[in-house]
């Protein structure tokens, strides 16, 4: 049997295999706690993310299952990669990934970024998005704190817990407000990969200016700030609004003209402003795509069409509309973990991974 070691981090029990030592807290999110650790097998530093009570509700179980499936499927230099996963005796799930020293949020709050860093970071964000979108996945929650960076300026997008299928019908209220695309606020239901391009544009603007472009205090204020810079949405965009209340609100706003971004970003290169103009477009159908943005003149120092891969196959979203009980999600999760480790479910190693009662669940639903 695997040996598990317990440690208290921020009042939370971290229960991990003895393979990982030197636990240090890195960050706390709504759904998990992240610690740095040393992998005794490889000698490399890693990040260990504890998913809090993943089997407490069907919604949380499904969210965890979705993130696990995505991390297994998405394999790209600019996407965080999964190196290990296990279930502890207390039935918590732990994702182990590579450790990067900082994130873009911390960098932006510490100092202004020089042009070559802005270019290189934006290039890597868009390179990652091109791959993710080609897999049929929308990140939905792209923001500086979800963009990890190491000392070599290598960048990786993380936190796919909110990611969804490319689907004309989607639920609203997902991404952090400052980076949220207007179609999420306006229609709530219908959006696609373009929401990530909007978020990337907001991040690009923040790298140029050193502060958030649209720091809304609430949903209404957020939309108002956007219209102050980009003008009133075109009529054909307004017509796509599903909610009567939202439609009334938008029509009640004073008509505003789009302001030239060059006036706001006076110190930015014309090429940078041009790319930003193409990313921050109200109509998602007219917003530049990741592949097109990579070929923009502003990113020419890094653009290499032979080294900007797309996914070999689409992500399988067949589970996503399933309304299943916790125990069923648990069995599915266990199966995915065994598949990750290439373990036959009948052997002893399989029993090790079933420490937290998953074995009992499988017996119940066999």
Swiss-Prot record:
Record's GO cellular component terms: cytoplasm; nucleus
Cofactor(s) recorded in Swiss-Prot or TrEMBL: Mg(2+)
Primary location group: cytoplasm
Keywords, alphabetical: ATP-binding, Cytoplasm, Kinase, Nucleotide-binding, Nucleus, Phosphoprotein, Serine/threonine-protein kinase, Transferase, Virulence
Phenotype of null mutants: Renders conidia sensitive to heat stress and oxidative stress as when mpkC is also deleted. Leads to delayed growth at high concentration of NaCl or sorbitol. Leads to reduced mpkA phosphorylation, and the double mpkC and sakA deletion completely abolishes mpkA phosphorylation. Affects the cell surface and the extracellular matrix during biofilm formation and reduced the adherence.
Enzyme Commission code: 2.7.11.24
Binding site for ATP: 26-34, 49
GO molecular function (one): protein serine/threonine kinase activity
Pfam families per record: Pkinase
PROSITE patterns listed in its UniProt record: MAPK (PS01351), PROTEIN_KINASE_ATP (PS00107), PROTEIN_KINASE_DOM (PS50011), PROTEIN_KINASE_ST (PS00108)
Phosphotyrosine: modified positions: 173
SMART domains: S_TKc
Domain of life per record: Eukaryota
Motif residue range(s): TXY: 171-173
PTM note: Dually phosphorylated on Thr-171 and Tyr-173, which activates the enzyme. Environmental stresses such as high temperature, osmotic stress, cold stress or ethanol stress modulate the activation of sakA via phosphorylation.
Activity regulation field: Activated by tyrosine and threonine phosphorylation. Deactivated by protein phosphatase 2C homolog 2 ptcB.
Positions of the Protein kinase domain: 20-299
Residues at the catalytic site: 141
Subunit structure: Interacts with the AGC kinase ypkA. Interacts with sakA upon osmotic and cell wall stresses.
Protein known as: Mitogen-activated protein kinase sakA
Source organism (scientific name): Aspergillus fumigatus (strain ATCC MYA-4609 / CBS 101355 / FGSC A1100 / Af293) (Neosartorya fumigata)
Lineage of origin: Eukaryota, Fungi, Dikarya, Ascomycota, Pezizomycotina
Gene: sakA
């Amino acid at each position: 049997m695997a040996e598990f070691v317990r440690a208290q981090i921020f009042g939370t029990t971290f229960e991990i295999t003895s393979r990982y030592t030197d636990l240090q807290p890195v960050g706390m999110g709504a759904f998990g706690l992240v610690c740095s650790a040393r992998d005794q097998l490889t000698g490399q530093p890693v990040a260990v993310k504890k998913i809090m009570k993943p089997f407490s509700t069907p919604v949380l179980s499904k969210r965890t299952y979705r993130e696990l499936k995505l991390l297994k499927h998405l394999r790209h230099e600019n996407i965080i990669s999964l190196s290990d996963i296990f279930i502890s005796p207390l039935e918590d799930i732990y994702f182990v990934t590579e450790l990067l020293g900082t994130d873009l949020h911390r960098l932006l709050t510490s100092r202004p970024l020089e042009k070559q860093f802005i270019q290189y970071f934006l290039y890597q964000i868009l390179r990652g998005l091109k791959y993710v979108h080609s897999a049929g996945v929308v990140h939905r929650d792209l923001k500086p704190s979800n963009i990890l960076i190491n000392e070599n300026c290598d960048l990786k997008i993380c936190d796919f817990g909110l990611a969804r299928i490319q689907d004309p019908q989607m639920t609203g209220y997902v991404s952090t407000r400052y980076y949220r695309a207007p179609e999420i606020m306006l229609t709530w239901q219908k959006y696609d990969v373009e929401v990530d391009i909007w978020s990337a544009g907001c991040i690009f603007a923040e790298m140029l200016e050193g502060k958030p472009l649209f720091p809304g205090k609430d949903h209404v204020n957020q939309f108002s700030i956007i219209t102050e810079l980009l003008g009133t949405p075109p009529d054909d965009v307004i017509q796509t609004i599903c909610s009567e209340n939202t439609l009334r609100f938008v029509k009640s706003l004073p008509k505003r003209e789009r302001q030239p971004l060059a006036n706001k970003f006076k110190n930015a290169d014309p090429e940078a402003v041009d790319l930003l103009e193409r990313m921050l477009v109200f109509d998602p159908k007219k917003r530049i795509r990741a592949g097109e943005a990579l070929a923009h003149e502003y990113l020419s120092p890094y653009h290499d069409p032979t080294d900007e891969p797309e996914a070999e196959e689409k992500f399988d979203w067949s589970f996503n509309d399933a309304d299943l009980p916790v125990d069923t999600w648990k069995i599915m999760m266990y199966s995915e973990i065994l598949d990750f480790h290439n373990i036959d479910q009948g052997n002893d190693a399989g029993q090790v991974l079933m420490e937290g009662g998953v074995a009992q669940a499988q017996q119940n639903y066999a």
